[in-house]
C-alpha cells in the first residue's frame, strides 16, 4: 500500500513563523533561519517516522487564484504576509528539491485546492493519504 503525504507548504511556513517568533534562530550572518530550520526538521521527522512512499509539498502561487475571480473580496481583509515568510519561500523550495521532494505550485490554485484534487484522484487506489 502506498503511503502518500501531501503538505500545504504555506500553512507550515506560517506555523514555523509563529512557533519561532519569540525566540528566532539566526545564522552567523544575522539572517533569521527559523522557518527553514523548523520546516526542514518537520519534513525529516515525517520521513523518519512515517516512511512515506510519496511526498509532495504544495505552495500557493504568487498571483491571485480562481477564488479571487469568483469572489473579489476573498482574503480582502487579510494583512500581507510578513517579510520573513515571503523570504523563506524560495530557499525552502530549494531545500525540498535537494531532498528530491516534489514541489507543486499551480497557477490559479491554492495549495489546499491542489491537495484536495490529488487526494480525490488517489482515493481508493490502495493508498493511505
PLM regions and their residue ranges:
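Noncatalytic, basic helical substrate-engagement surface that gates or grips nucleic-acid strands
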Residues: 2-129
Amino acid at each position: 500500500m502506498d503511503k502518500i503525504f501531501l503538505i500545504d507548504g504555506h500553512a507550515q511556513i506560517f506555523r514555523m513563523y509563529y512557533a519561532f517568533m519569540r525566540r528566532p534562530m539566526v545564522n552567523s550572518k544575522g539572517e533569521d533561519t527559523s522557518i527553514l530550520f523548523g520546516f526542514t526538521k518537520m519534513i525529516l521527522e515525517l520521513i523518519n517516522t512515517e516512511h512515506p512512499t510519496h511526498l509532495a509539498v504544495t505552495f500557493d502561487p504568487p498571483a491571485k487564484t480562481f477564488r479571487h475571480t469568483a469572489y473579489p473580496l476573498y482574503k480582502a481583509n487579510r494583512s500581507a504576509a510578513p517579510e520573513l515568510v515571503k523570504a523563506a519561500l524560495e530557499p525552502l523550495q530549494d531545500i525540498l528539491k535537494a531532498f528530491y521532494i516534489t514541489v507543486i505550485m499551480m497557477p490559479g490554485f491554492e495549495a489546499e485546492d491542489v491537495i484536495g484534487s490529488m487526494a480525490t484522484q488517489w482515493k481508493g487506489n490502495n493508498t493511505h493519504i
